[in-house]
């Protein structure tokens, strides 16, 4: 059974094939409908704008029928196990995408389902977002070769998936943030064992210098305890001064929603180097490609 849970579950060639398909679907070179006659469930333990709309539209464009399930529609909170939910949904659906609070929910669902499971986001990773981001970088710079990615702030789920991508595609990744907010040591060790060039620093200027991409995310994610996060993260705000340290054609990226004046200034996110709305659009195309490769028998 093919699932899409983490980037590290795939080899580089397989992910590149998905990116190639995403580009063809976006350009109109691929107008196939590989999900024709298929029903794809969408489970949301956390609400979403981009994930909900991009998957629902994408499933429909590929010829499938989306079936949306919120946490209130399921029995998970009232005693039914994740394992049983996976077994039941397998009798009705051809695949399921889940946006979950805990990564373990996704892995347990996949272990017990007889249909493909796609990770729409968990507390540990966000692989669909990174596929859209990689597509955006290729559009802007032609390829991923020689890319220097600067991540600012929290070593969160999105950062974790960037680490996996760096190990698989071989670009340089610089993670600038407070030491207390660094990504898991085991994940960093795995990536470095794969040959990834990953730099950890508490100096945002050093991380941004000569970077081709500067990326950040909200400082306080949905469900997180704010605590001292905003104070701790303030030195890692994406500003125009920091963008000037990067390459002249560097792009700014953010998975959205963004809080202007916090992790990024309005001048940057609304400026000419910002690619945030290209990223948002590419969620649609990247996820269509993922679904085609994971769900269809013809990819």
Give each language-model segment a name.
Residues 32, 94-165, 254:
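Anion-binding alpha/beta catalytic cores of soluble intermediary-metabolism enzymes, centered on
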Residues 39-40, 44-92:
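Active-site cofactor/substrate anionic-group-binding motifs, chiefly glycine-
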Residues 45-57, 141-216:
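Glycine-rich phosphate/diphosphate-binding loop of Rossmann-like nucleotide-binding domains
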Residues 67-89, 112, 164-165, 183-196:
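Active-site-proximal loop->helix
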Residues 249-250, 256-299:
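Adenosine-phosphate binding glycine-rich loop
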């Amino acid at each position: 059974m093919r699932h899409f849970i983490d980037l590290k579950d795939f080899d580089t060639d397989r992910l590149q094939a998905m990116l190639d398909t995403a580009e063809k679907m976006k350009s109109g070179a691929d107008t196939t409908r590989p999900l024709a006659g298929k029903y794809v469930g969408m489970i949301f333990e956390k609400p979403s704008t981009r994930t909900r709309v991009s998957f629902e539209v994408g499933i429909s464009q590929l010829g499938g029928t989306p079936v949306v399930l919120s946490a209130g529609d399921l029995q998970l909170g009232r005693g039914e196990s994740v394992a049983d939910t996976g077994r039941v949904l397998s009798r009705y659906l051809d695949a399921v995408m889940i946006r979950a609070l805990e990564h373990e929910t996704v892995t347990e669902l996949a272990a017990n389902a007889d249909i493909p499971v796609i990770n729409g986001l968990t507390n540990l990773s966000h692989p669909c977002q990174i596929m859209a981001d990689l597509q955006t970088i290729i559009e802007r710079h032609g390829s991923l070769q020689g890319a220097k990615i600067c991540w600012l702030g929290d070593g969160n789920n999105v950062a974790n998936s960037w680490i996996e991508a760096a190990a698989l595609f071989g670009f340089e990744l610089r993670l600038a943030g407070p030491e207390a907010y660094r990504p898991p040591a085991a994940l960093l060790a795995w990536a470095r064992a794969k040959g990834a060039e990953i730099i950890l620093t508490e100096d945002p200027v050093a991380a941004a210098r000569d970077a081709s991409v500067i990326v950040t995310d909200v400082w306080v994610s949905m469900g997180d305890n704010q605590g001292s996060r905003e104070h701790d993260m303030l030195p890692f705000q994406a500003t125009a001064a920091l963008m000037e340290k990067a390459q002249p054609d560097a792009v700014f990226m953010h998975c959205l929603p963004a809080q202007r004046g916090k992790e990024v200034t309005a001048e940057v996110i609304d400026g000419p180097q910002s690619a945030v709305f290209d990223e948002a659009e590419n969620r649609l195309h990247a996820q269509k490609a993922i679904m085609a490769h994971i769900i269809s028998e013809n990819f």
